[in-house]
Amino acid sequence: KFIGLLLGVEKEGNERFAAIEKRYNELKELTADGKVKKCPIVFSGELRGGNWYAVGGKSFLAQLFKDAGADYFLKDDERSGGVTLDFETVYNQADDADFWRIVNSFPGTFSYEALKEQDPRYADFRAFREKGIIYCNMKNTPFYESMPTEPEIVLADLLHIFHPDLLPDHEPVYYSRLK
């Protein structure tokens, strides 16, 4: 809406916004009111300089996880912005999580082995052991540039990963499971 207004194409901007909102809500409805049997637990972030960076339970990302039928490991955290944690805190809260979401800029092919080389303790997480890492490489995907204007596509990616039976034919754009 804002960009349409800014560029003098308010009508087109409003129409585009309405179409995105409609599709997002249709996708969100797939997991609403207990329609999924299991809500997987997901955590996010990585260690950087000895600190684990994630976002709070009131963030856009936490809402996306909820709308995709997943429980974010910090869902009860009242913050909407960045959260700095130590490894032990994350491990205690996310050790048994089903999925781990990682967004980074990795040169080359990111893999479980490359992740383990960053910190061997990563291999102790269940999501690592059971190949539940959700990944976006910003070297190949304009995540922060495009994602804010395509939340319905991000939601579809997450739905496809968390509940593959709901969108079996979806082709991921931003997130896919790490191989």
Model-assigned labels for residue ranges:
Residues R23, L27-Y112:
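Flexible, glycine-rich surface segments
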Residues L74-D76, S80-K179:
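C-terminal soluble interaction/assembly domains
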Residues K1-G50, K75, K139-K179:
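Extracytoplasmic substrate-binding proteins
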